[in-house]
């Protein structure tokens, strides 16, 4: 089972395309929708929904995957639910760059202070990070500088922030998922 979390643009047709691409790895791909506008509510909702899906699956090696803001959540929810994560261009600083787009961006900073101390150290090697050198929305190098101590980083030379085509990375994702 692969759980897919969309980014800030929840209505983008690219979400369906990514789900279709992920089905080449595992036919059981489940998209969880969330508001993107209310971080504390989103966290509770995502934890509940992911836990429910994990209770109902026979897959002993599930994967949670997210793009952009979905990558932010996939890393944290995956850690809390003890499943591997794959993130594409994760928005690691939504409290800085979501100003004016969501109601309470400061809630992201609050969530970070309430998260497990050094959670990335405890999550070491359980998240695969794919960053685009062409990301027009986020500073990919800043993300790499923060994450490379803990996770494998794969650089993509062609995709933009929304990462429409993940297919060049599917075999690596599949191998990562099978590690459990």
Curated annotation (Swiss-Prot):
| Top-level taxonomic group | Bacteria
In terms of Gene3D superfamilies, this protein maps to: alpha/beta hydrolase (3.40.50.1820)
- Disulphide bridges in this chain? none
Pfam families (alphabetical): UPF0227
The UniProt entry, under InterPro entries, shows: AB_hydrolase_fold (IPR029058), UPF0227 (IPR022987), UPF0227/Esterase_YqiA (IPR008886)
**What PANTHER family does its record include?**
ESTERASE YQIA-RELATED, UPF0227 PROTEIN YCFP
Similarity comment text for this entry: Belongs to the UPF0227 family.
Q: What is this protein called?
A: UPF0227 protein KPN78578_10770
Taxonomic lineage per UniProt? Bacteria, Pseudomonadati, Pseudomonadota, Gammaproteobacteria, Enterobacterales
């Amino acid at each position: 089972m692969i759980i897919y979390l969309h980014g800030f643009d929840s209505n983008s047709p690219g979400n369906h395309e990514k789900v279709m691409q992920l089905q080449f790895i595992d036919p059981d791909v489940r998209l969880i929708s969330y508001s993107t506008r209310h971080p504390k509510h989103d966290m509770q909702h995502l934890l509940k929904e992911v836990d429910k899906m994990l209770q109902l699956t026979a897959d002993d090696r599930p994967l949670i995957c997210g793009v952009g803001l979905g990558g932010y959540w996939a890393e944290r929810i995956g850690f809390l639910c003890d499943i591997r994560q794959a993130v594409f261009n994760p928005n690691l600083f939504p409290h800085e760059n979501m100003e004016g787009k969501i109601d309470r961006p400061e809630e992201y900073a609050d969530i970070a202070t309430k998260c497990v101390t050094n959670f990335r150290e405890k999550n070491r090697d359980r998240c695969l990070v794919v960053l685009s050198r062409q990301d027009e929305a986020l500073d990919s190098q800043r993300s790499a500088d923060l994450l490379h101590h803990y996770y494998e980083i794969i650089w993509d030379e062609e995709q933009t922030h929304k990462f429409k085509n993940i297919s060049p990375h599917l075999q690596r994702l599949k191998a990562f998922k099978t590690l459990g």
